[in-house]
Amino acid sequence: MQAVQQEIAQALKVQPPFANAAALEAEVARRVAFIKDCLANARLKTLVLGISGGVDSLTAALLAQRAINELRAETGDKAYTFIAVRLPYQVQHDEHDAQACLDVIKADEVHTVDIAPAVRALAAEVAALKNGSPTLVDFVVGNVKARTRMVAQYTIAGARAGLVIGTDHAAEAVMGFFTKFGDGACDLAPLSGLVKNQVRAIARSFGAPESLVEKVPTADLEDLEPGKPDEASHGVTYAQIDAFLHGQPVDQAAFDIIVATYRKTQHKRELPFAP
């Protein structure tokens, strides 16, 4: 492991690879306990999470629903609730995957909020967007979509006295691959410190089908490139990112991209600048 790999892995609190099935189950139990502790410390009984159709939100939701199920069983209090939220922009091209995720999760409640009217209304009122290039406008509005989704989740959480769950993990965090104050905003991040293959392994341990576990990851925020794979945006694969974070050798081109992107996106992983 090179020094910079160790530095980044420590900063992101990257967890070691699962040695075996028992280690995986122990990590699942630890993260479920973490979610339960967050609710106890906040003195709240509701969790809210947006479901995209990807493996990250699927895995976070499976952990959340298990935590809620355990709390109800332990306390006898039926008020403990997990709310899964669908947040499409009009009609989502992979809606069938989102519905398949919901079938696996079996959430206590499922809500749907179409973010398109809010996103379009805001974009129409921002004069700075009117003269931008199509590519720039598409990128900026893509971030508006992510932030609007989080506004919707916090609106539900506020109405139901709940906490909002985020889906950030180490393989996304190192690349700064989230919208600042969008999907990067949450009350708790139960996947933090995991690399992508560990997120997939946890989903698989819950019995999620391979079609969802191995689905090509996409943020799907840009209308001009719908369904654009994350890896096309990164310039490296998740396998390379995972290997880097676990101190394994990666080719020099991938190494340089990961380090440069980590440094360029440092502001996204920090609190606002203050004097």
From Swiss-Prot:
Q: Which molecular function GO terms apply here?
A: ATP binding; glutaminase activity; metal ion binding; NAD+ synthase (glutamine-hydrolyzing) activity; NAD+ synthase activity
Q: Give residues annotated as binding ATP.
A: 50-57, 167, 196, 218
* Signal peptide residues on this chain, from the entry's feature table: none
Q: Which NCBIfam families does the protein's record reference?
A: nadE (TIGR00552), PRK00768.1 (NF001979)
Q: Which UniProt keywords apply?
A: ATP-binding, Ligase, Magnesium, Metal-binding, NAD, Nucleotide-binding
Q: Identify the coding gene.
A: nadE
Q: Give the record's pathway.
A: Cofactor biosynthesis; NAD(+) biosynthesis; NAD(+) from deamido-NAD(+) (ammonia route): step 1/1
Query: Which Pfam family, any one, appears in the UniProt record?
Result: NAD_synthase
Oligomer and partners = Homodimer.
Say which enzyme class the record assigns.
ligase
Residues annotated as binding Mg(2+) are: 56, 172
Query: What role does it play?
Result: Catalyzes the ATP-dependent amidation of deamido-NAD to form NAD. Uses ammonia as a nitrogen source.
Protein name, entry field? NH(3)-dependent NAD(+) synthetase
